[in-house]
From Swiss-Prot:
Changing residue 44 to V: ATP hydrolysis-deficient. Forms only dimers in the presence of ATP. The keyword Magnesium applies. It comes from Thermus thermophilus (strain ATCC BAA-163 / DSM 7039 / HB27). It is an enzyme of class 3 (hydrolase). Its EC number is 3.6.4.-. The gene is soj. ADP binds at residues 17, 19-22, 207, 209. SUPFAM superfamilies: P-loop containing nucleoside triphosphate hydrolases (SSF52540). It comes from the Bacteria. This is Chromosome-partitioning ATPase Soj.
Length: 249
């Protein structure tokens, strides 16, 4: 069977605090700088991608799932479009429990080159909807102990989704985040991940970086906030690497 072309990419990890939303925001910004028409969908009821981009919205993902047209719900930010999370999204967690393909149906004719789905840090119905809608998954992993176990658990979930809901789904790559090369632990974790998962691990590593950490408080991507910082350079390289993997599909 031919592999599906990757256009929709879920960013997923059941563990919070691994740089998932930071990656979603900044990957979107640099993919847009590569000339792609990009939509970022904030599926986390906490709305961190939405607030981190300085957007306040009354309507967003929940309203798309209720049948409202996408074009009236998106917000332009730094060269790409954001479909925001709003407080109503908490209710969708219950409503979507029996509808794992609702998001896939709602995004059927979205018209973008690439769609990034920022999933909640849990195996909620919203996360399952993201995995059912995507062709590729990026898994951000913090360079810390237990990283290997966390990735293995998520990959088992991906296999279940592929078997039951979405045979097109595949792992696009594992991304090491919050990396401090001065520590032996970070070096060991990266080495373990590469030894275990091989080419599935992106060559790009996202460093611990003050500018990256502070950018959301200004409502900006790292490309806007500190375009010459190590974090900015890392996400630019990641965007190039993601595009190379997408084009290989």
């Amino acid at each position: 069977m031919l592999r599906a072309k990757v256009r929709r990419i879920a960013l997923a990890n059941q563990k919070g605090g691994v740089g998932k939303t930071t990656t979603a925001i900044n990957l979107a910004a640099y993919l847009a700088r590569l000339g792609k028409r990009v939509l970022l969908v904030d599926l986390d009821p906490q709305g961190n991608a939405t607030s981190g981009l300085g957007v306040r919205a009354e309507r967003g993902v929940y309203h798309l799932l209720q049948g409202e047209p996408l074009e009236g719900l998106v917000h332009p930010v730094d060269g790409f479009h954001l479909l925001p999370a709003t407080p109503d999204l908490v209710g969708a967690t219950v409503e979507l429990a029996g509808a794992p393909t609702a998001l896939r149906e709602a995004l059927r004719d979205e018209g973008y080159d690439l769609v990034l789905l920022d999933a909640p840090p849990s195996l909620s119905p919203l996360t399952l909807n993201a995995l059912a809608a995507a062709e590729g998954v990026v898994v951000p992993v913090q360079a810390e102990y237990y990283a290997l176990e966390g990735v293995a658990g998520l990959l088992a979930t991906l296999e279940e989704v592929r078997a039951g809901l979405n045979p097109r789904l595949r792992l696009l790559g594992i991304l090491v985040t919050m990396y401090d090369g001065r520590t032996l632990l970070a070096q060991q974790v990266e080495a373990q991940l590469r030894a275990h998962f091989g080419e599935k691990v992106f060559w790009t590593v996202i460093p611990r970086n003050v500018r990256l950490a502070e950018a959301p408080s200004f409502g900006k991507t790292i490309a806007q906030h500190a375009p010459t910082s190590p974090g900015a350079h890392a996400y630019r390289r990641l965007a190039e690497e993601v595009m190379a993997r997408v084009q290989e599909a």
